[in-house]
Curated annotation (Swiss-Prot):
Keywords: Cytoplasm, Gluconeogenesis, Glycolysis, Isomerase. Gene3D superfamilies: 1.10.1390.10, Glucose-6-phosphate isomerase like protein, domain 1. This is Glucose-6-phosphate isomerase. It comes from Pseudomonas entomophila (strain L48). Catalyzes the reversible isomerization of glucose-6-phosphate to fructose-6-phosphate. It comes from the Bacteria. The gene is pgi.
Length: 554
C-alpha cells in the first residue's frame, strides 16, 4: 500500500529500534576524537552535486550511523514515496491532491498526467506568458495610464506568494535587470503600505496581486489599498488594467477586481503556496532578474530533482540532510535547527525555510488522522552569518540545548572589498569548527596561565571559558550564488522536508493549523468594530478587545 494511505508507526520499525540502541552506544562519541583518528573523515562524509558542496563530517555520526539511517529510509519505503510524488499520485491525502511543484521545472518535452490530462503543455504555456510579459515591461512596451513605461513593480502577496519570490529576488540581486525595480507588500500593517507607496508614482507602477484563491485577507486588503491609492494619484478605473495583474486560480474574482482576463496568470491546486515560486508566483522574480535567469533557476531545481530521484540514499543530499535532522530531533532531543547563511544576498533564506519546514512538518497527526508517536518538525531559525556571531551564537556554543546548524557560504563574492570575503569565509568555517571542537577545562586554564593570571583567578574564570563542543553542523558551499545553484539549493531543502514527512508518516502539504486563526480573526474583528456584540469565547481575548475599543482612535 502507498505510504500516504497506510501510515506507519515509525517507532515500531526494526530500523528505529536499531537506531535507539545505536544512540546509546554513541553517548560518548567525540567528533574531536573522530577527526583525530580518521584522516579521511572529511572525504567520507562530504559530497558534491548540482553546484553545491556538502560537508556533513562535523556531525555526531560514524559510518554505522549513516547505514542505520539509510536503513530507516528504506524501511519506510522512501524510494516508493519519491516515485509517488513525482508521478502525480494524490499524496496530499487530507486535501485529495497530487503534489507537483516539481512539474514546474521539468523540460517541455516531458509528459505528466493529472486526472488523465498531460499538464506539461499548460506549464510551459504559462512560462511563455511570463516571458512575453517580462519582455514587454523590460522593453518599455507596457505603459501606464500616462503612456510612460513601467519603472516599479509591487508584488502583493503573503506567505508563499511573498517569502520565496522575495528570497530569490534578493539573493540574485547581482543579476537584476536595469530599468525596473521590484518591491514586496505582504503585511496588512498600514505602515508597510505607507512607506512603500511614498516612493512610488502611480503612473509608472504595476501591481501584481498574488493569491491562489483571490480571497486572502491581507492580500486583498493591500490590493484594495493600492487601487485606492492609484485612483487618488490620478489613475482611472478604465485604465486599471494597465496597472494591476493577477496570479490566481480564481479568474472571476480577479476580473471583478478590474484585471483583464489576459493579464491573469493561472495557478493549479497541485502547487502549494510554499512551493510556488517556480510558478507564475515567481513572476516578480522573472521581472527582477529576467526570464533567461528565471529559467536557469528552474533548471537548477530540476537538476536537484534528478539527483534526488537517482542518487543512492547514502550519497543523496536531501536524503542525508533529512536523516540527520531525524537523528537529532528524535534521538538526541533537538527541538530547533539553525540556518546560518554567510552571504548578504541570502539573508532571507531563513524566513523562506521557516515557512517551508515549519508549515510543512509542524504536524501532530499521521496521514490517517491518528496521533504521531514521536516529535516531528523542529523550530527553524537563524540569520545572516557574522551578525549572528555577535548575537545568538553564544547559545549555540555554551547553551544547554543541542541545536544543529547549517552554514551556507559562497567561495566568491560579487562585491570584493579588500580581504572582507576571506574573513567572511574564515568566520563561517571557524564557527563550525568551534562548535565541533569546543574548549576543554585544561585548555581554558592553560590559556589563562599563558596570560600570567594567578591560580586563584584561573580557578574562578576557567569554568566560564569552557565550551562543550561536539555540537553538530553541516556546511554547504557554493562557488558563487547563481540562478542555477540557488534553484538547486532551494529544491534541496524542499526535498529534505518531504523525506522527513515520509519518515514520520505525516502530510507535508497541508496547513490546517493556519486556518483556525483566520476563522477566529473574523469574529475578533467584528467585536473590535462593534458589529458583533456577543463576548469572545474567552475572557482574555474579550479583555484585549475591550482595551482596544476603549483607546483606539481612527
Amino acid at each position: 500500500m502507498a505510504y500516504y494511505r497506510t501510515p506507519h508507526d515509525v517507532t515500531a520499525l526494526p530500523a528505529w529500534q536499531a537506531l535507539q540502541q545505536h544512540r546509546d552506544a554513541m553517548q560518548g562519541f567525540s567528533m574531536r576524537e573522530a577527526f583525530a583518528a580518521d584522516g579521511k573523515r572529511f572525504e567520507e562524509f562530504s559530497l558534491s552535486s548540482c553546484g553545491l558542496f556538502l560537508d556533513y563530517s562535523k556531525n555526531l555520526i560514524n559510518e554505522q550511523t549513516r547505514d542505520l539511517l539509510v536503513g530507516l529510509a528504506n524501511e519506510v519505503g522512501l524510494a516508493d514515496a519519491i516515485k509517488s510524488m513525482f508521478s502525480g499520485e494524490i499524496i496530499n491525502a487530507s486535501e485529495g491532491r497530487p503534489v507537483l511543484h516539481t512539474a514546474l521545472r521539468r523540460p517541455v518535452g516531458d509528459k505528466l498526467s493529472v486526472n488523465g490530462v498531460n499538464v506539461m503543455p499548460d506549464v510551459h504555456k504559462v512560462l511563455n506568458q511570463i516571458t512575453e510579459l517580462v519582455g514587454r515591461i523590460h522593453d518599455g512596451l507596457w505603459r501606464g495610464y500616462s503612456e510612460k513605461p513601467i519603472t516599479d513593480v509591487v508584488n502583493i502577496g503573503i506567505g508563499g506568494s511573498f517569502l520565496g519570490p522575495e528570497l530569490v529576488s534578493e539573493a540574485l540581486l547581482p543579476y537584476a535587470q536595469r530599468g525596473v525595480r521590484c518591491h514586496y507588500l505582504a503585511n496588512i500593517d498600514g505602515s508597510e503600505f505607507h512607506e512603500l507607496s511614498a516612493n512610488l508614482r502611480a503612473e509608472t507602477t504595476l501591481f501584481i496581486v498574488s493569491s491562489k484563491s483571490f480571497n486572502t485577507l491581507e492580500t486583498l486588503k493591500n490590493a484594495t489599498a493600492a487601487r485606492t491609492w492609484y485612483l487618488a494619484q490620478g489613475g482611472s478605473e478604465a485604465e486599471l488594467y494597465r496597472h494591476f495583474i493577477a496570479v490566481s486560480s480564481n479568474k472571476a474574482a480577479a476580473v471583478a477586481f478590474g484585471m483583464r482576463e489576459e493579464n491573469i496568470f493561472p495557478m493549479w491546486d497541485w502547487v502549494g503556496g510554499r512551493y510556488s515560486l517556480w510558478s507564475a508566483i515567481g513572476l516578480p522574480i522573472a521581472l527582477a532578474i529576467g526570464t533567461a535567469n528565471f529559467k536557469e533557476l528552474l533548471s537548477g531545481a530540476y537538476t536537484m530533482d534528478q539527483h534526488f530521484q537517482t542518487a543512492p540514499f547514502d550519497k543523496n543530499m536531501p536524503v542525508l540532510l533529512a536523516l540527520l535532522g531525524v537523528w537529532y530531533g528524535n534521538f538526541w532531543g533537538a527541538q530547533a535547527h539553525a540556518i546560518l547563511p554567510y552571504d548578504h544576498y541570502l539573508r532571507n533564506i531563513t524566513k523562506h525555510l521557516q515557512q517551508l519546514d515549519m508549515e510543512s512538518n509542524g504536524k501532530s497527526v499521521l496521514q490517517d488522522g491518528s496521533p504521531v508517536k514521536t516529535d516531528t518538525g523542529p523550530v527553524i531559525w537563524g540569520g545572516v552569518g557574522c551578525n549572528g556571531q555577535h548575537a545568538y551564537h553564544q547559545l549555540l556554543h555554551q547553551g544547554t540545548q543541542l541545536i544543529p546548524a547549517d552554514f551556507i557560504v559562497p567561495v566568491v563574492s560579487f562585491n570584493p572589498v579588500a580581504d572582507h570575503h576571506q574573513w567572511l569565509y574564515a568566520n563561517c568555517l571557524s564557527q563550525s569548527q568551534a562548535l565541533m571542537l569546543g574548549k576543554t577545562r585544561d585548555e581554558a586554564e592553560a590559556e589563562l596561565r599563558a596570560k600570567g593570571m594567578n591560580e586563584d583567578d584561573i580557578a574562578k574564570l576557567a569554568p566560564h571559558k569552557v565550551i562543550p563542543g561536539n555540537r553538530p553542523s553541516n556546511t554547504l558551499v557554493v562557488e558563487r550564488i547563481s540562478p542555477r545553484r540557488l534553484g538547486a539549493l532551494v529544491a534541496m531543502y524542499e526535498h529534505k522536508v518531504f523525506v522527513q514527512s515520509v519518515i514520520w508518516g505525516i502530510n507535508a502539504f497541508d496547513q490546517w493549523g493556519v486556518e483556525l486563526g483566520k476563522e477566529l480573526g473574523k469574529g475578533v474583528y467584528q467585536r473590535l468594530v462593534g458589529s458583533l456584540e456577543d463576548s469572545a469565547e474567552d475572557g482574555s481575548t474579550q479583555g484585549l478587545i475591550n482595551y482596544f475599543r476603549g483607546r483606539h482612535r481612527g
